[in-house]
Every structure is written in C-alpha cells, then in structure tokens.
C-alpha cells in the first residue's frame, strides 16, 4: 500500500469511482491520504452509486476497504453561509 498502514484509511472520506453492488460485488473508491490520492477496492453492505461520498469504516488489507455512504454534517451550514 505504498507505505500507508491499513489503519490510516479508517475514518478517511472517499469518492466512489466504480459503483459498489453491496454483497453482490465490490466497486472502487478514490481516497485522499497523506497529501495524495489512491484507489482501493470498495465493499459495502448496500449498493453505492458512482460519485457518492463514502466513509472508510474498515480495512480488509491488500488494498481493499469497507465503506459506508457519508454526508458531511457541516455541508448544511456551509450552504446556509452562501445564501
């Protein structure tokens, strides 16, 4: 993993670049870590569409992670500030 320990990925936010199919199969996620971006195989409990923002909740090792859909809780406040 280019020197990045698996545990570092947990809690990172990523963008789905290949949709996941839930238990039917993985997709792919782009995660920003340590000043760069890397792709990982992404597994999820439910299907997640391409373009969705996700949270890495577990590492499976060997460049594979479990993800969950994520909505930034501060996004609502940022939208209010723009009005």
How should each PLM-predicted stretch be described?
Residues 2-81:
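Terminal membrane-proximal soluble interaction domains of membrane-associated proteins
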